[in-house]
Structures are given as structure tokens and as C-alpha cells.
């Protein structure tokens, strides 16, 4: 992400300005503090691994796409608009089979976590 300073200026002229990678990374981790502990741990681990994996990317298109996607994610979690989010058919059609499997696994895990918290909450009554 060495060429990102030039990219910020370019993207700023075309639309929303992109945050520098380190600022975005820190803001996402701060936003995760509002999550329940299990979700926070999962989110923090995922964010850290993704930023680490993309640390040495030099392709400007990949850098812009990566930062724009994470900035959209940050905006969603900081405004709680993720709760009403859905995936369009066109977005799912663009996903690779590996991404669809990951999405399915994530869905299963979140349903299990939701079921476990609902069960533990009902046992306290």
C-alpha cells in the first residue's frame, strides 16, 4: 500500500475520500468495541488478518477496492445500517464459489451464536 497517498487524492476527486489504511484499520477496531465479546473477537481477528494479507499489495486498483470495501463496512457498522442489509442477486452472482461457501459458513455460525445467546437468555428468566 505504498502508493496510496496518490490514490487518496485521485479517489477524493471522484467521490468519497478514502481514509488512509492505518486510520481505517484503527477506526474499524474501535467500532468493534460496541459488539458483544464473541462478535468483537471474530471481527477483530478477521480485520487484522485481511489487512495483514493485503499489506504489500502494489496494484492501485486492488488497493482502492480493498480500502473502499472496508470503508463501506466501517460506515455500516458505525451507523448500525448493517442490521437491515441484504445481498442482491447480482452481488451473489459475482461471488466465487469459495466466497459463497464462506458466506454460508458465516451464516451457520451466526445462527448458532444467535441460538446460543437466546437459549442462555431464556434460562436466566
From Swiss-Prot:
Recorded superkingdom: Eukaryota
Any one biological process term the GO annotation gives: mitochondrial respiratory chain complex II assembly
Keyword tRNA processing tagged: no
The UniProt record lists the keyword Chaperone: yes
Subcellular location: Mitochondrion matrix
Span of the transit peptide along the chain: 1-42
Pfam families: Complex1_LYR_2
Keywords associated with the record: Chaperone, Gluconeogenesis, Mitochondrion, Transit peptide
Matches recorded under InterPro entries: SDHAF3/Sdh7
GO CC, one annotated term: mitochondrial matrix
Function: Plays an essential role in the assembly of succinate dehydrogenase (SDH), an enzyme complex (also referred to as respiratory complex II) that is a component of both the tricarboxylic acid (TCA) cycle and the mitochondrial electron transport chain, and which couples the oxidation of succinate to fumarate with the reduction of ubiquinone (coenzyme Q) to ubiquinol. Promotes maturation of the iron-sulfur protein subunit of the SDH catalytic dimer, protecting it from the deleterious effects of oxidants. May act together with SDHAF1.
Quaternary organization: Interacts with the iron-sulfur protein subunit within the SDH catalytic dimer.
Family, similarity comment: Belongs to the complex I LYR family. SDHAF3 subfamily.
Protein name: Succinate dehydrogenase assembly factor 3, mitochondrial
Organism listed in the record: Eremothecium gossypii (strain ATCC 10895 / CBS 109.51 / FGSC 9923 / NRRL Y-1056) (Yeast)
Origin organism lineage: Eukaryota, Fungi, Dikarya, Ascomycota, Saccharomycotina
